[in-house]
Structure formats: C-alpha cells, structure tokens
C-alpha cells in the first residue's frame, strides 16, 4: 500500500511530454523514393531453378512441405505451411509440379504473398489450379 502511494505520487508529479520518433531508412530519398544502390553493392546471385524430373512423389511432397514451412518471411511461412497441410497430401503429380514452380521460381517471396492475397495480379505462368486453391484459403 505504501509503495503504491509513492508510485502514484511519482507518476502524478512527472509529466513528460510524449515524443514520437519517426525513423526513416537510409535508402529513402526526401521525395519518398529510394536512392539507387551504390556501385560497390552487388546483388547476390541466385542460382536458376532446376526442375527435378525423376524425383519420387513422396520425396517431392516431403521437400515441398519443408520448403513451405521454411520461407524467407513469416507471412509466407504461415500461408504456405497451412496450405501444404491442407492440400499437399491429396495433390496430383501435375499439381505438385505447379506448386513446386510456384514456390521456387519467383525470387521474391513478397510476390507469392501479394498474388495469393490479391494485392497484385498473378502472372499468367503462375495462374494455375494450385494458385486458385491457394487463393481460396
């Protein structure tokens, strides 16, 4: 009780102004655009996707389940792992190939997320039965 009254007195006496700090990224220009990357910064090389033609179906399912869970961003980890849990076990070999291309061809995970939630239009090459299933979730 004594401690509570002391704390109440301190809180009532100390009226600090509320300050909001706005943090800007170092890559942002004053007009809101992004500064061009300096010449000494090199984008990492991403090896091209190679389709695994003779992979057994059960091995492919296990690999796709793992890849669905271990993405580069939390949103896709949640979205794709939930999708895989619901649909992966019943997919046909053609659907497995479509899903494999969908999660491994685009180099940007945000593209997959934006297509699946309808923020951006899906490119024709990824507008498949599997993408329809993903959008229906």
Curated annotation (Swiss-Prot):
Domain of life where this protein originates: Eukaryota
GO biological process: mitochondrial electron transport, succinate to ubiquinone; mitochondrial respiratory chain complex II assembly; protein-FAD linkage; tricarboxylic acid cycle
Subcellular location: Mitochondrion matrix
A Pfam family recorded for this sequence: Sdh5
InterPro entries found in the cross-reference section: SDH (IPR005631), SDH_sf (IPR036714), SDHAF2 (IPR028882)
Assigned GO CC terms: mitochondrial matrix; mitochondrion
Primary localization: mitochondrion
Keyword field: Chaperone, Mitochondrion
Family, similarity comment: Belongs to the SDHAF2 family.
Other remarks in the entry: This protein may be expected to contain an N-terminal transit peptide but none has been predicted.
Function per UniProt: Plays an essential role in the assembly of succinate dehydrogenase (SDH), an enzyme complex (also referred to as respiratory complex II) that is a component of both the tricarboxylic acid (TCA) cycle and the mitochondrial electron transport chain, and which couples the oxidation of succinate to fumarate with the reduction of ubiquinone (coenzyme Q) to ubiquinol. Required for flavinylation (covalent attachment of FAD) of the flavoprotein subunit of the SDH catalytic dimer.
Subunit and interaction comment: Interacts with the flavoprotein subunit within the SDH catalytic dimer.
Name of this protein: Succinate dehydrogenase assembly factor 2, mitochondrial
Organism of this sequence: Artemia franciscana (Brine shrimp)
């Amino acid at each position: 009780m004594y401690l509570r009254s002391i704390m109440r007195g301190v809180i009532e006496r100390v009226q600090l102004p509320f300050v909001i700090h706005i943090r800007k990224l170092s890559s942002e220009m004053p007009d809101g655009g992004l500064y061009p990357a300096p010449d000494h910064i090199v984008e990492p090389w991403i090896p091209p996707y190679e389709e695994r033609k003779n992979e057994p179906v059960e091995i492919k399912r296990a690999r796709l389940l793992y890849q669905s869970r271990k993405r580069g961003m939390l949103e896709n980890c949640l979205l794709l792992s939930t999708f895989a849990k619901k649909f992966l076990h019943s997919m046909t070999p053609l659907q497995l190939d479509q899903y494999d291309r969908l999660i491994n061809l685009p180099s940007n995970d945000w593209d997959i997320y934006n297509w699946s939630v309808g923020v951006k239009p899906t490119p024709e090459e990824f507008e498949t039965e599997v993408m329809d299933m993903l959008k229906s979730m």
